[in-house]
Amino acid sequence: MPQLDTSTWFITILATILTLFIIMQLKISTYYYHSNPEPKTTKMTKSLIPWEIKWTKIYSPLSLPLR
């Protein structure tokens, strides 16, 4: 049974890891990061909904008068 030639495995694995490292560095370097992150100020808008304008009272069945 012939033996497997493993003499080129080291350089193949090393080249693969180096290539993956370079590709990942190039991908990460394309992202834009803010140098000073600040919270975004959002303006709260109050929407006028009909049931918020008028006062309504909700009666629970237990508080209704007996008939």
Swiss-Prot record:
It is a single-pass membrane protein. Keywords: Acetylation, ATP synthesis, CF(0), Hydrogen ion transport, Ion transport, Membrane, Mitochondrion, Transmembrane, Transmembrane helix, Transport. One of its GO terms (biological process) is proton motive force-driven ATP synthesis. One of its GO terms (cellular component) is mitochondrial membrane. Mitochondrial membrane ATP synthase (F(1)F(0) ATP synthase or Complex V) produces ATP from ADP in the presence of a proton gradient across the membrane which is generated by electron transport complexes of the respiratory chain. F-type ATPases consist of two structural domains, F(1) - containing the extramembraneous catalytic core and F(0) - containing the membrane proton channel, linked together by a central stalk and a peripheral stalk. During catalysis, ATP synthesis in the catalytic domain of F(1) is coupled via a rotary mechanism of the central stalk subunits to proton translocation. The chain crosses the membrane at residues 8-24. It is found in: Mitochondrion membrane. It comes from the Eukaryota. This is ATP synthase protein 8. InterPro entries: ATP8_mammal (IPR039017), ATP8_metazoa (IPR001421). The modification N6-acetyllysine is found at residues 54, 57. Belongs to the ATPase protein 8 family. F-type ATPases have 2 components, CF(1) - the catalytic core - and CF(0) - the membrane proton channel. Component of an ATP synthase complex composed of ATP5PB, ATP5MC1, ATP5F1E, ATP5PD, ATP5ME, ATP5PF, ATP5MF, MT-ATP6, MT-ATP8, ATP5F1A, ATP5F1B, ATP5F1D, ATP5F1C, ATP5PO, ATP5MG, ATP5MK and ATP5MJ. Interacts with PRICKLE3. It comes from Artibeus jamaicensis. GO terms for molecular function: proton transmembrane transporter activity. The modification N6-succinyllysine is found at residue 54. PANTHER family: ATP SYNTHASE PROTEIN 8 (PTHR13722:SF0). The gene is MT-ATP8.
